[in-house]
Amino acid sequence: MNKKSLPLMALRDMVVFPGVIAPIFVGRQKSLQALSHTTVSEEDNSKYILVTLQKKFDQENPSKHELNNTAILAKIIQIVKLPNNTAKILIEAVARVKLSNIKGNDAFEANYEIIPDEEIFDVNNMRSLVDNAVQLFSKYAINDKKVNAEIIETINKEISNSTNFINIINILASHLITSLEAKQHLLEETSPFKRITTVISTLTSNIVNSETEQALQQRVRKQIEKTQRDYYLHEQMKAIQKELDEDKSELADIEKKIKSLKLSKEAKEKAESELKKLRSMNQMSAESGVTRNYLETLLSLPWGKYDNSKIDINQAEKILNRDHFGLEKVKERIIEYLAVLQRSSKIRGPILCLIGPPGVGKTSLVKSIAEGMGRKYTKFALGGVRDEAEIRGHRKTYLGSTPGKILGQLKKVKTSNPVMLLDEIDKMSSDFRGDPASALLEVLDPEQNSHFVDHYLEVEYDLSNVIFIATANSHDLPRALSDRMEKIYISGYVEEEKLQIAKNYLVPKQFKMHKIKKDEITISETAILDLIRYYTKESGVRALEREIGALTRKALKQILADKTVKHIAIDSSNLEEFLEAKKYNFGLAEKEDQIGSTTGLAYTEVGGELLTIEALAFPGKGEIKTTGKLGDVMKESAMAAYSCFRSRATNFGLKYDNYKDFDIHIHVPAGAIPKDGPSAGCALFTTIVSLMTKIPVHRTVAMTGEITLRGNVLPIGGLKEKLLAASRGGIKTVLIPEENVKDLKDIPPNIKESLEIISVSNIDQVLKHALVETPINK
């Protein structure tokens, strides 16, 4: 197309799009000069002018370099002269053009070339996009109420013409609420698809902003109306209260309560000070509500209130034996604790902490202690507590502040000397809000807890009469907290103990819970043993109780569904008719002695477990690889076991060439369960020796113990739990460190009778008992 030349006018507050009719007020001298230089076109007898946005909007006299090159060829429809040498023109944007050779001092003039839009190939897609844009524009116009209804009507007419997509895009673009730079960028874009996409994006943003603004205005309006309404009601209430003199009556009750309670001197002074402050306040103010809540909380605490507990250790022992089977050493220590309390009204000894796997009766023991002492029982669950304000309370300055849970529990039981269970004390954690374990130090320390200060109360409260007893699954407690406690370890139950607990406690409890009559259902000992062996795998009896409950419900359902059934007897022969198939295998996992596979013993938070350790050798560089989600300590045990093996390889009839070209892969199933701890050295060493010498390991032998590089066996913890696991797993022989022999006195006699327990002091003795034949060649 041949280039043409026309006068050029700079705009600083608008961008005009093709097909749009727009008014322009002309006041700058250069713009007036450009307008005066326009001439009538020979083609249609009309005047034309070029208009473009200047780059700097605050520039009064922009140079030619400060003008955008993409402009509009506009047809002048009307010129109206105004006072003060200004004018108003009405233009119709004809086409988008590219400017070149801009010149002129008094007025701009430029050559131009019309810029065509890219051709639309995908008409259906464009129609869909344009429809979407028009719908969004209609929604925006309705919400914003700034767009003339005639504009919407014009667009709706244009949409009916499927070939006029470009005009619709231009009309929509001209009414967008966006920056001038964004509109100029939209004008410069030649792709219709990119332009309509930008229009849709901007309209969506405008709608969101408009809706947000309307919602905010509505919320502010409602808040203002509510505030005015509340003020009116409060003034009315205040007038009524003034007439009835209710305020004086309420404050008089608070004053009477302060005088009647056995408050400490500090607490009484604080209460009187707050009451005095409350009298001088506007009763409808926020501050009076805070002060009133504080006084109510302060006066609701059990100041000087104590249960008349008379400890009788014989009666307490009967209660413990009634509620718990076995646990003789634990009950003996509790009775000793109560004996000291019976003789001394205040105890300065350590806090008891019951540590054991889930379901062994830790919580119920604390309830029995409270009953045996004749005191109320309360529980503070510490599992998942991260905020020290849960212990010490929130300061009054915070909105909705309350005292800590310690004082909250005392307020609940209405006594200052309950038995308080601090449950799951090992499950606390810390974050940016503080360390609750450190906050507990003041609560549990007998030298400090008589002067405990809650952040909310801001006065001392005596906690020295509260009996705190903690429970935990793991002995891994913060050092400072651990030093203030006496740990009592509760091991898991053996099979015989579980049987007795089920017969004497769990079955009657479930029958009572489900309203089972005595002659309706009977559960034999063989059925209970099958439940223990094949449906549960735990140190406690929690899962066993659930299975008995499920068994009871299914039997009850059968009785109620079939009126002819009067009695159901459950034994091992029909157990699976009521429950699902057996969940666990009872006995040995391996049917034959295996090479490179050893049974170890592990101690976890849920009790003892059998730990299978297996290994394979394959060509490599003499390295060792471990898998099974092992911790750092266990990985180091594997390295130590391998080094010990290599140092003794010649004793096993192996030459250096037998293992230097082989890598060993040690795996401990199951791979998803984390494993760590210093007690797997013997099992790791035995696995490696069995693998390299091709001598099987006795499948009936399990072992525990760490080893040194010189082959000495070191002592371990959790012996009782490990032996219980060995007994449950069908193990016949257990190898334990020689230094752990002293711990056998705590093992139940039936466990010691069911297992051959052999003490070992070095790895030669381990191999002698673990392997099918001795590999050592003297």
Curated annotation (Swiss-Prot):
Main location as per UniProt: cytoplasm
Active site positions, chain numbering: 679, 722
EC class: hydrolase
Single GO term (MF): ATP-dependent peptidase activity
SUPFAM superfamilies with a match to the protein in the record: P-loop containing nucleoside triphosphate hydrolases, PUA domain-like, Ribosomal protein S5 domain 2-like
Pfam families in the record: AAA, Lon_C, Lon_lid, LON_substr_bdg
E.C. number(s) listed in UniProt: 3.4.21.53
Subcellular location: Cytoplasm
Protein name, UniProt field: Lon protease
Organism: Rickettsia felis (strain ATCC VR-1525 / URRWXCal2)
